[in-house]
């Protein structure tokens, strides 16, 4: 198992993994949606070039990822935040160290970006059906809940 930064050559394998994420997220309107591969590729490019993203690779196949993008603060555009948008591990690799190793690599680099002033802070999200992961124990502060209309 290898944890490394996202590269453009990963996109096709990663799109397949993200389709698994879409199908298992527990939100009907997303699970039943039609994905637009070109849009997903553009988001991945933004994650690769203007964010911080890692993949978990096993035998040349992408089996896990943590993807993030940099976004400006609403009131202070020069203040940037790193926002995690997907953290997913293939069901056959859950229970291994892949998820923890992806998180550790992401957090370590994000902390360096924060110390250097490149970003002000970084965030992690948790879906309602995500595994129980104690972010506060890992130095994060609980700041919000999000709700979605529709099914």
Residue ranges and their predicted role:
Residues 73-84:
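A conserved beta-turn-beta hairpin within the catalytic core of GNAT-like acetyltransferases
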Residues 85-96:
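A short, internal acetyl-CoA/4′-phosphopantetheine-binding micro-motif in the GNAT/acyltransferase core
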Residues 42-55:
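A short helix-loop-beta-strand connector motif used in the catalytic cores of GNAT acetyltransferases and
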Residues 95-109:
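Conserved acetyl-CoA-binding loop-helix of GNAT-fold acetyltransferases
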Residues 2-16:
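A short beta-loop-alpha structural element at the N-terminal edge
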Residues 55, 61-70:
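Conserved beta-strand in the GNAT
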Residues 22-42:
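Conserved GNAT-fold acetyl-CoA-binding loop/helix
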Residues 106, 116, 120-133, 150-151:
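Conserved beta-strand-loop-alpha-helix junction that forms the acyl-donor binding cleft
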């Amino acid at each position: 198992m290898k944890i490394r930064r996202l590269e453009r050559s990963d996109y096709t394998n990663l799109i397949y993994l993200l389709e698994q994420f879409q199908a298992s997220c527990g939100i009907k309107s997303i699970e039943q949606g039609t994905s637009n591969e070109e849009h997903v590729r553009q988001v991945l490019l933004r994650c690769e070039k203007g964010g911080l993203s890692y993949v978990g690779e096993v035998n040349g196949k992408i089996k896990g990822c943590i993807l993030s993008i940099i976004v400006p603060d609403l009131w202070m555009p020069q203040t940037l935040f790193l926002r995690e948008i997907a953290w997913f591990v293939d069901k056959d690799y859950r229970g291994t160290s892949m998820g923890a190793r992806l998180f550790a690599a992401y957090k370590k680099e994000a902390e360096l970006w924060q110390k250097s002033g490149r970003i002000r802070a970084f965030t992690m999200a948790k879906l309602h059906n995500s595994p129980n992961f104690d972010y506060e124990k890992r130095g994060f502060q609980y700041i919000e809940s999000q709700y979605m209309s529709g099914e």
